[in-house]
From Swiss-Prot:
<dbReference type="InterPro" id="IPR027417">
    <property type="entry name" value="P-loop_NTPase"/>
</dbReference>
<protein>
    <recommendedName>
        <fullName>A-type ATP synthase subunit B</fullName>
    </recommendedName>
</protein>
<comment type="subunit">
    <text>Has multiple subunits with at least A(3), B(3), C, D, E, F, H, I and proteolipid K(x).</text>
</comment>
<dbReference type="InterPro" id="IPR020003">
    <property type="entry name" value="ATPase_a/bsu_AS"/>
</dbReference>
<keyword id="KW-0472">Membrane</keyword>
<dbReference type="GO" id="GO:0046933">
    <property type="term" value="F:proton-transporting ATP synthase activity, rotational mechanism"/>
</dbReference>
<dbReference type="Pfam" id="PF00006">
    <property type="entry name" value="ATP-synt_ab"/>
</dbReference>
<dbReference type="Pfam" id="PF22919">
    <property type="entry name" value="ATP-synt_VA_C"/>
</dbReference>
<dbReference type="InterPro" id="IPR022879">
    <property type="entry name" value="V-ATPase_su_B/beta"/>
</dbReference>
<keyword id="KW-0406">Ion transport</keyword>
<dbReference type="Pfam" id="PF02874">
    <property type="entry name" value="ATP-synt_ab_N"/>
</dbReference>
<dbReference type="GO" id="GO:0005886">
    <property type="term" value="C:plasma membrane"/>
</dbReference>
<comment type="function">
    <text>Component of the A-type ATP synthase that produces ATP from ADP in the presence of a proton gradient across the membrane. The B chain is a regulatory subunit.</text>
</comment>
<dbReference type="GO" id="GO:0005524">
    <property type="term" value="F:ATP binding"/>
</dbReference>
<keyword id="KW-0375">Hydrogen ion transport</keyword>
<keyword id="KW-1003">Cell membrane</keyword>
<comment type="similarity">
    <text>Belongs to the ATPase alpha/beta chains family.</text>
</comment>
Length: 463
């Protein structure tokens, strides 16, 4: 029953404790735990049956004693205090300030699990979000209200890319306020300092809310961190009409925490030991992106995950791909070449790109230009494989131009500086500069009128 206090803890293992002899306890209920020394911790009911409750302890179960620990069930779900004053602040994984600033005086308290959106109330994601990164803006465009994950690998610069996107992202031609909610799970102190420094030195912190769960924090916190971030994002988007970009890194650490808790509960494991409900659990996070009819605000998600052994068929990227609307794939081969960001545009995809580009959104030539760049780069890549077998001497003059185009595409279009913020028009013009490498007769995916208007040969003649 709400408010009842129990000292009937029968077992503690991993991040979990079992409390017996309880009555009226509900799933998801917040629990207050007090040690013999008076230290207080919080937890949440994971399972309630008959007279028994399984509780996950957010701050971990270290130093908890079965005989002296007291547990009080509050009768409430986990809520996060929300306020506009959270912009510019840094919090830990469970929402406590870690930037030396004061506690937040809440305007409201919201359930971390959010309110489910009626599918009929959803508005279709449209409108281009400029990240300033050519490989994304030009080839795999991010659309307002979309969920577009970044598939990375261990040692690849996804943290730099996340910080760059958070710093540069904007909605063109809009007066609406833009905000970034950044949630990091299971990161090292070095990574946490990098994100803090990156946001503070560039001034991006002023429009951002940061949640940082460190690697030595209890794994259970990682389950709460993305939900805290999304609850704040929903508040900013739907109460204050802001355009909110939510960046979640690293979802692999989140899934590992999910597996750890599942193993502690002795649940039947699914693929590679992950719980069978991982798809549903990930969906409760990813599906909180979107737009709502009658509301000006939006939530756009960019979850980042590191693929174990660079395996895109691993359960985490595999299930993520089913729920989200595309993927940005980072390439170890491009990284070895010294190309940043090492985005491989061929396996990358933005399923909603077609609805966020073109006349009135980016530029009229954007859809056909991106298709032509994609086709030309794919041809150049396949010719590289051929050259490895037969040598470059066997290639025709046109084939050599495709080969040169592929090299320039990687060095000039994909590659850019960490502090380089390219406009969409600079990106598109750069694409045309590269296509000028090829014979005009090879540009079969672009209308003649666009060639005459944007091709460097005619553009310079016209000017």
């Amino acid at each position: 029953m709400p408010g009842m206090e129990y000292s009937t803890v029968s077992k503690i293992y991993g991040p979990l404790m079992i409390v017996e002899g309880v009555k009226g306890v509900a799933y998801g209920e917040v629990v207050e735990i007090e040690t013999e020394s008076g230290e207080k911790r919080k937890g949440q009911v994971l399972e309630a049956r008959e007279n028994l409750a399984i509780v996950q302890v957010f701050e971990g179960t270290r130093d908890l004693d079965i005989k002296t620990t007291r547990v009080r069930f509050t009768g409430e779900t986990l809520k996060v205090p929300v306020s506009m004053d959270m912009l510019g602040r840094i919090f830990n994984g469970i929402g406590k300030p870690i930037d030396g600033g004061p506690e937040i005086i809440p305007e409201d308290r919201r359930d971390v699990h959010g309110a489910p959106l009626n599918p009929v109330a959803r508005a279709y994601p449209r409108d281009f979000i400029q990240t300033g990164i050519s490989a994304i803006d030009g080839m795999n465009t991010l659309v307002r209200g979309q969920k577009l994950p970044i598939f990375s690998g261990s040692g690849l610069p996804h943290n730099m890319l996340a910080a760059q996107i958070a710093r540069q992202a904007k909605v063109l031609g809009e007066e609406e306020q833009f905000a970034v909610v950044f949630a990091a799970m299971g990161i090292t102190y070095e990574e946490a300092n990098f994100f803090k420094k990156s946001f503070e030195e560039t001034g991006a912190i002023e429009r951002a809310v940061l949640f940082l769960n460190l690697a030595d924090d209890p794994a259970i916190e990682r389950i709460i961190t993305p939900r805290m971030a999304l609850t704040v994002a929903e508040y900013l988007a739907f109460d204050y009409d802001m355009q909110v970009l939510v960046i979640l890194t690293d979802m692999t650490n989140y899934a590992e925490a999910l597996r750890e808790i599942s193993a502690a509960r002795e649940e039947v494991p699914g693929r590679r030991g992950y719980p069978g409900y991982m798809y549903t659990d990930l969906a409760t996070i990813y599906e909180r992106a979107g737009r709502v009819r009658g509301k000006k605000g939006s939530i756009t998600q960019m979850p980042i995950l590191t693929m174990p052994d660079d395996d895109i068929t691993h359960p985490i990227p595999d299930l993520t791909g089913y729920i989200t609307e595309g993927q940005i794939v980072l390439s170890r081969e491009l990284h070895r070449k010294g190309i940043y960001p090492p985005i491989d545009v061929l396996p990358s995809l933005s399923r909603l790109m077609k609805d966020g580009i073109g006349k009135g959104r980016t530029r009229e030539d954007h859809p056909q230009l991106s298709q032509q760049l994609y086709a030309a780069y794919a041809e150049g890549r396949s010719l590289r494989d051929l050259v490895a077998v037969v040598g470059e001497e066997a290639l025709s003059e046109t084939d050599r131009k495709y080969l040169k185009f592929a090299d320039r595409f990687e060095r000039e279009f994909v590659a850019q500086r960490y502090d380089e913020d390219r406009s969409i028009f600079e990106t598109l013009d750069l694409g045309w500069e590269l296509l000028a490498e090829l014979p005009e007769s090879e540009l079969k995916r672009v209308r003649k009128e666009y060639i005459l208007k944007y091709h460097p040969k005619y553009r310079k003649r016209g000017s």
